[in-house]
């Protein structure tokens, strides 16, 4: 289809639209200046619009009363502007001037699927990066345990393929491994053997066996731990589960005020001077954790409850006593008022009798 035939086809369609519009209008009289201004305004708008596939058709019915043709502005897809005059004139002008402009906009916007696919790829890539940067709970706990002293370190699980370290002798597998605040490692085996390592040793290497025996001299339930290792400051820190522990040092005697720092869920033991006849170099370690056992916590709660109930009973007793005193005071007041009332009644009778005798 050639360019000329396209223009003719568009003009024919526009004339048909103009005829239909003019027939549907009742009162469409406007001045020529208004039509020209509207046409110029539509030209500016069509010049600013950058959509190539946009076609605007403006139909303005204009007439000053007689012989004023309708002006139609057409913008072609190539950017050309065509003015088309209507053939049908307005039959009768109206006093009311109501300009009516009909704008038909046809826009075609093609959206490709490539943008959506690229956004989905970017979102999945960002999600994978966030998940890869997110630290694990074990890593966070290891960092916390390395920064804060006295918190047990969480050892990574070793594979079964790794062999036994050469510095560790053949011994029973320990059930619990703990680390003190000075860097020593303490392992408690199933048979009751305690193994302690020096602060300079690597991991659990260099563990030294400690003999733990029971003795009849200390109080029942206590445990004697004998060890020959000695640290730089002459003290040892270890953990033994139980309520009371007796520690014996073969080389140096522990200070009575020495505190064995505990980590994890193990109780804290405070070394104190023995109260019984124990061998020289043996001191008693009492666990303050036993003071906060569930049984004692329950007893403490029961004691507080009983104390509160006792205070409530005392307050109620005092309230009842004051109420009784108040009632008794009111009863005494009523009795006094009754006596006064009787006295006044007797005086009134006496005065009446006296008045009657005088009247006679």
Swiss-Prot record:
| Purpose | Transcriptional regulator that binds the cAMP response element (CRE), a sequence present in many viral and cellular promoters. Isoforms are either transcriptional activators or repressors. Isoform Tau is a transcriptional activator. Plays a role in spermatogenesis and is involved in spermatid maturation.
Tell me how the protein is altered or processed after translation.
Answer: Stimulated by phosphorylation. Phosphorylated on Ser-118 by TSSK4 in vitro.
Positions carrying Phosphoserine are 118, 145, 287, 290, 293
In the record, the note on similarity to other proteins reads: Belongs to the bZIP family.
What InterPro entries does this protein's entry cite?
A: bZIP (IPR004827), bZIP_sf (IPR046347), CREB1-like_pKID (IPR003102), Leuzip_CREB (IPR001630)
GO molecular function list:
DNA-binding transcription factor activity, RNA polymerase II-specific; DNA-binding transcription repressor activity, RNA polymerase II-specific; RNA polymerase II cis-regulatory region sequence-specific DNA binding
Residue ranges of domain KID in the record = 104-163
* Species in which this protein is naturally found: Canis lupus familiaris
Which UniProt keyword terms apply here?
Answer: Activator, DNA-binding, Nucleus, Phosphoprotein, Repressor, Transcription, Transcription regulation
Q: List the Gene3D superfamilies.
A: 1.20.5.170
Q: Where is this region: Leucine-zipper?
A: 330-351
- Locations listed in the record: Nucleus
Q: Where in this protein does the record put region Disordered?
A: 20-52
Region Basic motif: start-end pairs? 303-328
The bZIP domain sits at 302-360
Q: Its quaternary structure? A: Binds DNA as a dimer. Interacts with FHL5. Interacts with CDC34. May interact with TSSK4.
Gene that encodes it: CREM
Q: Which GO terms describe its biological process?
A: regulation of transcription by RNA polymerase II
Any one cellular component term from GO for this entry? ATF4-CREB1 transcription factor complex
Which taxonomic lineage does the organism of this UniProt entry have? Eukaryota, Metazoa, Chordata, Craniata, Vertebrata
Q: Is Kinase set as a keyword in this record?
A: no
Identify the main location.
Answer: nucleus
UniProt protein name: cAMP-responsive element modulator
């Amino acid at each position: 289809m050639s360019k000329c035939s396209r223009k003719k086809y568009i003009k024919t369609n526009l004339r048909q639209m103009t005829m239909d519009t003019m027939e549907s209008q009742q009162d469409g009289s406007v001045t020529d200046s208004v039509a020209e201004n509207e046409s110029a305004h539509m030209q500016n708008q069509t010049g600013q619009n950058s959509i190539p596939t946009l076609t605007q058709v403006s139909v303005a019915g204009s007439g000053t009363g007689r012989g004023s043709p309708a002006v139609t502005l057409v913008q072609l897809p190539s950017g050309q502007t065509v003015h088309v005059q209507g053939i049908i004139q307005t039959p009768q002008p109206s006093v009311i001037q109501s300009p009516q402009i009909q704008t038909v906009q046809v826009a075609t916007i093609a959206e490709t699927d490539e943008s959506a696919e690229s956004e989905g790829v970017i979102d999945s890539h960002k999600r994978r990066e966030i998940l890869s940067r997110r630290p694990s709970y074990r890593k966070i706990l290891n960092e916390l345990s390395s920064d804060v002293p006295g918190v047990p370190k969480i050892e990574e699980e070793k594979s079964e393929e790794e062999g036994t370290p050469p510095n560790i002798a053949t011994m029973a597998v320990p059930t619990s491994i703990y680390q003190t605040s000075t860097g020593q490692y303490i392992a408690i085996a199933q048979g009751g053997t305690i193994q302690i390592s020096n602060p300079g040793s690597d991991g659990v290497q260099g563990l030294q066996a400690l003999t733990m025996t029971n003795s009849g001299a200390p109080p029942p339930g206590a445990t004697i731990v004998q060890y020959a290792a000695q640290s730089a400051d002459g003290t040892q820190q270890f953990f033994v589960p139980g309520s009371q522990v007796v520690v014996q040092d073969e080389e140096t005697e522990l200070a009575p005020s020495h505190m064995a720092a505990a980590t994890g869920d193990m109780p804290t033991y405070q070394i104190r001077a023995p109260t019984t006849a124990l061998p020289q170099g043996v001191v008693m370690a009492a666990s303050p954790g036993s003071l906060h056992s569930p049984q004692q916590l329950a007893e403490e709660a029961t004691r507080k409850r009983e104390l509160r109930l006792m205070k409530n009973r005392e307050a109620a007793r005092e309230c009842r006593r004051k109420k009784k005193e108040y009632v008794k005071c009111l009863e005494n007041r009523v009795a006094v008022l009754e006596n006064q009332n009787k006295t006044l009644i007797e005086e009134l009778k006496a005065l009446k009798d006296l008045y009657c005798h005088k009247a006679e």
